From Swiss-Prot:
Keywords: Acetylation, Cell cycle, Cell division, Centromere, Chromosome, Coiled coil, Cytoplasm, Cytoskeleton, Kinetochore, Mitosis. Belongs to the dynactin subunit 3 family. Disulfide bonds: none annotated. Subunit of dynactin, a multiprotein complex part of a tripartite complex with dynein and a adapter, such as BICDL1, BICD2 or HOOK3. The dynactin complex is built around ACTR1A/ACTB filament and consists of an actin-related filament composed of a shoulder domain, a pointed end and a barbed end. Its length is defined by its flexible shoulder domain. The soulder is composed of 2 DCTN1 subunits, 4 DCTN2 and 2 DCTN3. The 4 DCNT2 (via N-terminus) bind the ACTR1A filament and act as molecular rulers to determine the length. The pointed end is important for binding dynein-dynactin cargo adapters. Part of the dynactin complex that activates the molecular motor dynein for ultra-processive transport along microtubules. Together with dynein may be involved in spindle assembly and cytokinesis. Residues 46-66 form a coiled coil. It is found in: Cytoplasm; Cytoplasm, Cytoskeleton, Microtubule organizing center, Centrosome; Chromosome, Centromere, Kinetochore; Cytoplasm, Cytoskeleton, Spindle. Its main location: cytoplasm. It comes from Mus musculus (Mouse). This is Dynactin subunit 3. One of its GO terms (biological process) is cytoskeleton-dependent cytokinesis. GO terms for cellular component: centrosome; cleavage furrow; cytosol; dynactin complex; kinetochore; microtubule associated complex; midbody; nucleolus. The modification N-acetylalanine is found at A2.
């Protein structure tokens, strides 16, 4: 039964191929694709039996397919022992990655929690708070600059007053010294 369905499936595929080749009108005359394929196979068989080099090529097709396989270079270039050594050399890194993946796996319920799922709902509030924070930072910078200017003014005033007091103190000392000297002269 299965062989019959395989034959029917193959027949339908050949008919579809004929429609592709010959168009929707069907086959032209009595030529069918299957007949052409049989003729090509017979011709190739005749050529192969007559030519020794072609026989050798047919035998080496499997080798050619094996060599064309992209993984073939990896199998030849890196022997199994080297692959094993590479894996063993990276053992600590692999184990650390496993531990990290286990931590992520353990935290998956947190990611699936209602709080995390509600984040999009709070995005507008967060954006508004971020704008307020930026405004407050700007205000803080302005207040800092203003405070710095006031402190510089205070320091200048204090320094000028200190210099003035020092000058007055020196003048007072000179006047007191002159006053003490005058009575002694009389």
């Amino acid at each position: 039964m299965a062989a019959l369905t395989d034959v029917q499936r193959l027949q339908s595929r050949v008919e579809e191929l004929e429609r592709w080749v010959y168009g929707p009108g069907g086959t032209r005359g009595s030529r069918k694709v299957a007949d052409g394929l049989v003729k090509v196979q017979v011709a190739l068989g005749n050529i192969a039996s007559k030519r020794e080099r072609v026989k050798i090529l047919y035998k080496k097709i499997e080798d050619l397919i094996k060599y064309l396989d992209p993984e073939y270079i990896d199998r030849i270039a890196i022997p199994e022992a080297s692959k094993l050594q590479f894996i063993l050399a990276e053992e600590q890194f692999i184990l650390s990655q496993v531990a990290l993946l286990e931590q992520v796996n353990a935290l998956v319920p947190v990611l699936d929690s209602a709080s995390i799922k509600a984040v999009p709902e709070h995005a507008a509030r967060l954006q508004r708070l971020a704008q307020i924070h930026i405004q407050q930072q700007d205000q803080c910078v302005a207040i800092t600059e203003e405070s710095k200017a006031l402190l510089e003014g205070y320091n200048k005033t204090t320094m000028l007053l200190s210099k003035q007091f020092v000058q007055w103190d020196e003048l007072l000392c000179q006047l007191e010294a002159a006053k003490q000297v005058k009575p002694a002269e009389e």
